[in-house]
């Protein structure tokens, strides 16, 4: 599809700019992909594209911190690839995604990184970056982590505590990985579920004849997420390095994060659109396809309170930035687990509907202000991953990634109208009020009037420098705590014989 405007230059008039600290009426001029001027009554130069944003909000382009496009996983490949996935992203107002390189155990991280980057560079329709998963530990991994940080623009590494016998690492390996993250100034991310207990829970369910999707949640209740979340935070804090819990899916896990934050631990939590927009009761649906569509890990929780409580945490700033974990599989792929839920490829959609789901469940419920919405869907992610204010803010010099948002327009989410490749939408039938009517990437319109106008492969890889704001003050915290570790000077122990012989 040809982009309607290749110049990266556009004038947006009469909108209300919303950043995470304030909002104000203004025109915005983007030139060659960079925001050039923000002021009232900017006169358009000859030939410049002008868009009227009267009664609309201008938001910083959304940032999705967690996607898995075309991920080889559980014997298949997720169907939203970097082209379709980023089309769906911009159709919902997201203009920057961070995907995951996931090396197989024993595979070179650099080799896997190069493969993922090749896949992405050929297809992305918006800017992107890459986290790297650490699925094994060795001197080689340690060396390659340094190269990824110093030469490839990676500042985040993910450990899986789940997926025993595939991605899962031990506590001891995680300890060494976290130490390495600290040395390199990279944030340690964790998929926090007790993988050994999940493995036992899965066996138990199958032995009991519970083979359907409901067995997925029953085998890995939220206690296993909360326990692993606590363990990951304790290990990270023992190293005194910032830790980021991905896809926080339960009240239990959120409570653990809150407890440690109150004690001054540098921990961040990422809720996802699924956990903020639906609940896990769908896994008990009598239609197998419907139930299997909601299978992901950690499970979307059946407790109906969860989505509201997670939104409350997000509003208070006790959870930080919203991802999606977009990892989609069609019916025939999910059916690989039709007789055994442990074989259902884990993953759901989210990248297109994320911002409207957060607006509907956050702003329209009175829990989030406009500014808090921007924080949750864009700027906090940019800060944590050290690309603020290039991304996550509408200001002079920032990237021209802008969403024209209509807070009063509604739509009903459906697989029949979404832009994903997947044949199911976990938000099916949900009416949302608050949608992206125009999405601008690097000063070019890529979504408008309900139509995409992307240029495949036009997105850029954005390197993320180490030692971002998440590391501020970490050394001092470490120093103060280490000063408390003192040895006691005492006389050497003497048993009675030694005592008598010295008299
Ligand atoms: O665990 C993840 O984040 C990846 C493998 C996607 N699948 C999922 O169920 N979350
Ligand atoms: Zn995960
Ligand atoms: Zn994931």
Curated annotation (Swiss-Prot):
GO molecular function, one term: dihydropyrimidinase activity
GO cellular component labels: cytosol
Modified residues (N6-carboxylysine): 158
Highest taxon above the source species: Eukaryota
Disulfide pairings: none
Cofactor binding, per record: Binds 2 Zn(2+) ions per subunit.
E.C. number: 3.5.2.2
InterPro entries assigned: Amidohydro-rel (IPR006680), Hydantoinase/dihydroPyrase (IPR011778), Metal-dep_hydrolase_composite (IPR011059), Metal_Hydrolase (IPR032466), Metallo-dep_Hydrolases_sf (IPR050378)
Keyword Zinc: yes
Catalyses which reaction(s): 5,6-dihydrouracil + H2O = 3-(carbamoylamino)propanoate + H(+)
Keywords: Hydrolase, Metal-binding, Zinc
Binding positions for substrate per the UniProt entry: 163, 346
PTM comment: Carboxylation allows a single lysine to coordinate two zinc ions.
Residues annotated to bind Zn(2+) 1: 66, 68, 158, 325
An annotated GO BP: pyrimidine nucleobase catabolic process
Pfam annotation, one family: Amidohydro_1
Cofactor annotation: Zn(2+)
Binding site for Zn(2+) 2: 158, 191, 247
Quaternary assembly: Homotetramer.
Role this protein plays: Catalyzes the second step of the reductive pyrimidine degradation, the reversible hydrolytic ring opening of dihydropyrimidines. Can catalyze the ring opening of 5,6-dihydrouracil to N-carbamyl-alanine and of 5,6-dihydrothymine to N-carbamyl-amino isobutyrate.
Family assignment from sequence similarity: Belongs to the metallo-dependent hydrolases superfamily. Hydantoinase/dihydropyrimidinase family.
Protein name as catalogued: Dihydropyrimidinase
Organism (species): Dictyostelium discoideum
Lineage: Eukaryota, Amoebozoa, Evosea, Eumycetozoa, Dictyostelia
